[in-house]
C-alpha cells in the first residue's frame, strides 16, 4: 500500500522536488496580491459604484496580465545582467513591493487606486511570466508540467485561504490601507526566495542566440496548434461569470456579512488545494482529452448548482464543491496550454496563452457584472452554463492527442 502511494507522488527525484518547492514558494507570495480585492469592492460599493463599474476597475488593473507575451519576448530575447530569468525576477518583485507600499500610504480615489494597483500588477504579471517559463522549461522534459502547475495553484489557493479569512475582516472594517500594506510585504518574500532558490547559468546576449530565438518565434506564429488552443481557451473562459456580481448578490439579496463572504472564499480555496492534489497524479495517468471533456462537464454542473445558492448552508456546500472541481477544470486547461507551447520560446508563448486565458476571464467578469445589473442573478447563471457547455463541441477540432504526442517527442529530444 505504501509503495503504491509513493508511485502516485509525481516528484521522484531531488531536483524535481526542489523545483516544486521553489514554484510553491513563489506562487504563494504572488497569491497574496489578492488580499485587498474584497476591501476594494466593498469600498467602491459604499461609494455608490455599480457591479459593472467595479468589474471595470478590476479589468483596468489586470491589463498588465493581458500583455504577458511582451514580457516573455523581453526575457527570451534580452538577458538582464547576463541572465534571462533571475535578474528580471528581482527587478519585478521590487516594483510590485514599491507600488504596494505607495498604495498603503493612503488615498481611495478611483484613478489613484487604478494607477498604482495596475503598476503593482505589472510587477507581479512579469514575475508570473518568468516563473511560468521556468516551469515549462523544467517541467516538459520531465513530463511534469501538470504536476508542477498543480503545486503552483495549490500554493496560490493556500494563500487564498489566508486572503479569504483576513480579507473578510479587512473588508468588514473597511481597512483598505492596511490591506495594501500587508499585500506589499509578499513581493519582498518572493524577491528573497528568488535570490535563494533560482539557479540559472549565464545567458549572454549573443547575436546568434537572438537570431535562433526569432526563428523559433516565427515558426511558432505559423503553428496551427497554438492558435487553435488559444481560441479554445478564449471561448471556454468567455462565458459570463459572476465575479463582483456574486458579492453584490451575497450582500444585497442574501444579507451575508463581509466576514462570512471572506470565510466562503477561504473554504473554496481549501477545496481548490484538494482539487490540485487530485489533479497532480491524474495528469500523468489520464489522457488530456478525457480530462478536458470531464472538466467542461463538471464546470457546467458546478455553474448550474449556483441556482441553489440561497442561504448560508447552500453557499458553503456549493462554494466548497465548486472550489475543488473548478481547480481541476482550470488545471486541465493550463496543462493543455503548457503542452502546446513551442520549444525555445516557452516564456513568450505560454505567456500568450495565459494572456488569452486572463483576457477571457476579465471579459467574462465584466459581461457577467453588466448582465447581473440588466437581467438579474438566475438568467446570468443559465447563460453562463449554456455557453460553457457549448465548448464541448469544439474539443474534436483541437486535436489534443496530437498536441500531447508532440510535447512528448519534444521532451525526448
Where are these regions (language model features)?
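Helix-loop boundary and gating motifs at the non-cytosolic
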Residues: 4-65, 227-232, 236-254, 261
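C-terminal transmembrane helical hairpin of 12-TM major facilitator-type secondary transporters
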Residues: 289-333
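Intracellular juxtamembrane helix-capping segments at the cytosolic ends
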Residues: 126-140, 328-342
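Juxtamembrane intracellular "pre-TM" segments in multi-pass secondary transporters
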Residues: 1-16, 199-229
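Multi-pass alpha-helical transporter architecture, strongest
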Residues: 103-104, 189-198, 382-413
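Helix-to-loop junctions at the C-terminal end of transmembrane segments
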Residues: 67-83, 171, 274-288, 372-373
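C-terminal ends and interior cores of transmembrane alpha-helices
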Residues: 90-108, 297-310
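Loop-to-transmembrane helix entry/capping segments in MFS-fold secondary transporters
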Residues: 51-52, 140-151, 258-259, 343-353
Amino acid at each position: 500500500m505504501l509503495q503504491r502511494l509513493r508511485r502516485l507522488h509525481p516528484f521522484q527525484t531531488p531536483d524535481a522536488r526542489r523545483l516544486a518547492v521553489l514554484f510553491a514558494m513563489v506562487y504563494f507570495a504572488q497569491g497574496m496580491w489578492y488580499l485587498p480585492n474584497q476591501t476594494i469592492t466593498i469600498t467602491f460599493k459604499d461609494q455608490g459604484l455599480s457591479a459593472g463599474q467595479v468589474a471595470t476597475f478590476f479589468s483596468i488593473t489586470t491589463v498588465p496580465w493581458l500583455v504577458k507575451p511582451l514580457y516573455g519576448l523581453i526575457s527570451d530575447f534580452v538577458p538582464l545582467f547576463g541572465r534571462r530569468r533571475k535578474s528580471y525576477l528581482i527587478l519585478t518583485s521590487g516594483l510590485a513591493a514599491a507600488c504596494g507600499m505607495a498604495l498603503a500610504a493612503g488615498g481611495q480615489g478611483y484613478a489613484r487606486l487604478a494607477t498604482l494597483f495596475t503598476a503593482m500588477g505589472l510587477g507581479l504579471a512579469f514575475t508570473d511570466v518568468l516563473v511560468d517559463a521556468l516551469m515549462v522549461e523544467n517541467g516538459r522534459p520531465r513530463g511534469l508540467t501538470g504536476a508542477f502547475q498543480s503545486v503552483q495553484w495549490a500554493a496560490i489557493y493556500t494563500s487564498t485561504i489566508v486572503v479569504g479569512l483576513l480579507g473578510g475582516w479587512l473588508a468588514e472594517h473597511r481597512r483598505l490601507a492596511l490591506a495594501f500594506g500587508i499585500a506589499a510585504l509578499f513581493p519582498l518574500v518572493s524577491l528573497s526566495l528568488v535570490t535563494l532558490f533560482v539557479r540559472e547559468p549565464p545567458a549572454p546576449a549573443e547575436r546568434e542566440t537572438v537570431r535562433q530565438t526569432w526563428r523559433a518565434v516565427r515558426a511558432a506564429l505559423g503553428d496551427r496548434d497554438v492558435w487553435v488552443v488559444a481560441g479554445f481557451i478564449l471561448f471556454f473562459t468567455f462565458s459570463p461569470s459572476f465575479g463582483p456580481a456574486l458579492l453584490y448578490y451575497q450582500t444585497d439579496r442574501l444579507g451575508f456579512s463581509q466576514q462570512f463572504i471572506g470565510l466562503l472564499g477561504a473554504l473554496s480555496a481549501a477545496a481548490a488545494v484538494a482539487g490540485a492534489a487530485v489533479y497532480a497524479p491524474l495528469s500523468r495517468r489520464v489522457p488530456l482529452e478525457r480530462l478536458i471533456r470531464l472538466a467542461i462537464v463538471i464546470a457546467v454542473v458546478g455553474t448550474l448548482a449556483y441556482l441553489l445558492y440561497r442561504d448560508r448552508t447552500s453557499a458553503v456546500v456549493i462554494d466548497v464543491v465548486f472550489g475543488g472541481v473548478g481547480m481541476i477544470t482550470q488545471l486541465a486547461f493550463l496543462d493543455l496550454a503548457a503542452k502546446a507551447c513551442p520549444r525555445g520560446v516557452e516564456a513568450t508563448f505560454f505567456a500568450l496563452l495565459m494572456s488569452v486565458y486572463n483576457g477571457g476571464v476579465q471579459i467574462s467578469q465584466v459581461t457577467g457584472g453588466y448582465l447581473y445589473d440588466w437581467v438579474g442573478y438566475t438568467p446570468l447563471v443559465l447563460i453562463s452554463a449554456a455557453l460553457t457547455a457549448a465548448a464541448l463541441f469544439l474539443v474534436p477540432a483541437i486535436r489534443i492527442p496530437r498536441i500531447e504526442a508532440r510535447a512528448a517527442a519534444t521532451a525526448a529530444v
